[in-house]
Amino acid sequence: SPHLTKLGADLTIKIGNYMNLDPFLGESIQGQKYEEGEFYKSHWDYYHPLSAEYKTYCEWMGQRTWTFMIYLNDVEEGGETYFKFLDLKIKPEPGLAIFWNNLYSFGWPNFKTMHEALPPTKGKKYILTKWYRAWSLI
């Protein structure tokens, strides 16, 4: 739909401007929905340099450098984003945006950004996520 395409383009530009990042470095915006009990296990958004995934996913756009995530709704219970090494739980609130650097400025992975999506225990959780890469195809 042309309206959805324009919305995606507008969001891409706004997020890029907010983070002071070139919009062309970003992957497509993705939406996620978590039903009660659904979760996403602990992970990093970067690809480990020694993994098979690194060659597959980083060869053409480089490593994931930044993550931007925005919560779209309140969750009655649960649904926090938990950063294990920071001992930080972030409760979903509509419009709350969080972002983090997946790499240090010298290029090494930032292990402190390991995070997980805890399951909503009452209600659903909706988020939008955008990842930024080291370089662009354009």
What are these regions (language model features)?
Residues S1-F99, L103-I138:
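Fe(II)/2-oxoglutarate oxygenase catalytic core
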